[in-house]
A protein has these predicted regions:
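Active-site helix/loop module of the DD-peptidase/beta-lactamase fold
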Residues: 82-86, 100-158, 223, 227-272
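N-terminal leader/targeting segments and the immediately adjacent pre-domain N-terminus
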Residues: 2-7, 17-75, 81, 99-105, ...
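Catalytic-site signature segments of enzymes, centered on catalytic residues
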Residues: 144-259, 280-294
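Catalytic loop of the DD-peptidase/beta-lactamase superfamily, centered on the K-T-G motif
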Residues: 26-63, 145-148, 152-154, 209, ...
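Short active-site loop at a secondary-structure junction
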Residues: 38-49, 71-133, 202-217, 281-284, ...
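Acidic-glycine-rich active-site phosphate/pyrophosphate-binding loop
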Residues: 63-71, 193-196, 265-270
Length: 397
């Protein structure tokens, strides 16, 4: 009898533990949703979508608010929008694939590839390597007098609000460049014979000595891939990244997209921006959905061999800067740089993105293998509240 009572007690305890685990599993998503809803409301976002992953599966998928506020169209897993500088991680993957194809190496001098010569007037005898483009120490900088004019808006495709246009004008954004290819733009920007050439397109030298985050330098890597591959960068990434991962609702240019699921991009909860592309589209112009982007995230976190070899992943995620001799203007307290990817000191690897009407973040935890992403259709000056929630969730074992 005593044995029976003991067994009964043990079974009761075991049942309680199992039920507790089930309840925890059921309430954790609700707890995460509550925290995200608080941040969503505090930031006055029109719409947002969050996905958490673990290995090859999605463990959390939830939308908040609207892709179209006026018509109350929910922001869903299939909603499409620009992802800003998260696009630079795609350049990283494309670059490593190009290296596997023996087009060049990270140490290749860009003048060994370009059809015109690039010289930093502040370092006339120096050279610029592909590696320095990937970690933003090349000495090429974003001249705001030119870069903000590289956005191409499509006001006739969708309704927009004049308040948003006025805001863009005040911020210096315009639609004044008529370049239609990376080749045209980079000749005009970097060649002394180019239409936009200026000493202001370059920072101090020598290359490798100073960190200056550069969209144009990032897109230059994509142009180098174009030169060696014979493909447009868009076609190269479709072939080696988007199609292998079945990212069927992702692309680079508005005319190539089905706009049915494209979110409106907002200045605030009411005023809408027109849709837009970028002349330097590789640096921030990928349009994708949370569902498609999660396929990419899971592939990267698992070192998926459909994209790259293990050696390429290792190279892509190797820290570029030493603590003893970092370049000027960078603080390694919170992050180092891989090949475009940010290597955060909290044990995660990722990248964020900003542009008019968008905010994004994508990351994975190198210890747990869990990852997360969020997309919102409004510029978010400070993503930290949302990022902290997701990073903490991904750290759980």
């Amino acid at each position: 009898m005593k044995t029976y009572k003991t067994l009964k007690t043990l079974l009761s305890i075991l049942t309680f533990v199992l039920l507790s685990n089930v309840i925890a599993a059921q309430t954790n998503p609700d707890s995460l949703t509550t925290k995200l809803q608080q941040a969503f409301t505090t930031e006055s976002l029109p719409g947002m979508y969050v996905i958490m992953t673990d290995g090859g599966k999605i463990t959390y998928s939830h939308g908040f608010g609207y892709a179209d506020v006026a018509n109350q169209v929910p922001y869903s897993a299939s909603t499409i929008q620009n992802i800003g500088s998260v696009s630079k991680t795609v350049i990283a993957v494309a670059l490593m694939k190009a290296i596997e194809l023996r087009y060049f190496t990270l140490e290749t001098d860009i003048n060994d590839v370009l059809p015109f010569k690039v010289t930093n007037p502040n370092d006339p005898n120096g050279k610029i390597t592909i590696r320095e483009l990937t970690n933003h120490t090349s000495g090429i900088v974003d001249n705001p007098e030119i870069y903000h004019y590289s956005y191409h808006f499509y006001p006739k495709l969708r309704a927009y609000d004049s308040v948003s246009i006025n805001t863009l004008n005040q911020m210096g954004f315009g639609d004044k460049l008529r370049d239609t290819t990376l080749a045209q733009f980079f000749f005009n920007y970097l060649s002394p014979q180019g239409q936009y050439y200026s000493k202001a397109n370059f920072g101090e030298g020598p290359a490798g000595s100073t960190s200056s985050y550069c969209n144009i330098g990032s897109a230059l890597v994509a142009y180098l891939i174009e030169i060696k591959s014979g493909f447009t960068y868009a076609d190269f990434t479709r072939k080696y990244i988007l199609k292998p991962l079945k990212m069927d609702h992702s692309d680079w240019h508005i005319p190539d997209m089905d706009l049915k699921n494209h979110a409106y991009l907002y200045l605030d909860l009411k005023n809408r921006f027109p849709l837009y592309d970028l002349v330097t589209y590789p640096d921030g112009g990928l349009k994708t959905s949370p569902e498609d982007l999660s396929k990419y995230l899971m592939a990267i976190a698992r070192h998926d061999k459909r994209l790259l070899t293990e050696a390429s992943y290792q190279a892509m995620f190797t820290a570029q800067f030493s603590k003893e001799h970092p370049p000027k203007n960078i603080n390694l307290t919170y992050r180092n740089k891989g090949i475009f990817w940010n290597l955060y000191t909290n044990g995660t690897i990722g990248h964020d993105g900003d542009d008019p009407g968008i905010g994004t973040f994508l990351f994975f935890n190198t210890t747990t293998g869990k990852g997360g992403l969020f997309l919102t259709n409004k510029y978010l000056p400070n993503k930290q509240a949302i990022v902290d929630v997701l990073v903490k969730e991904a750290a759980k074992k």
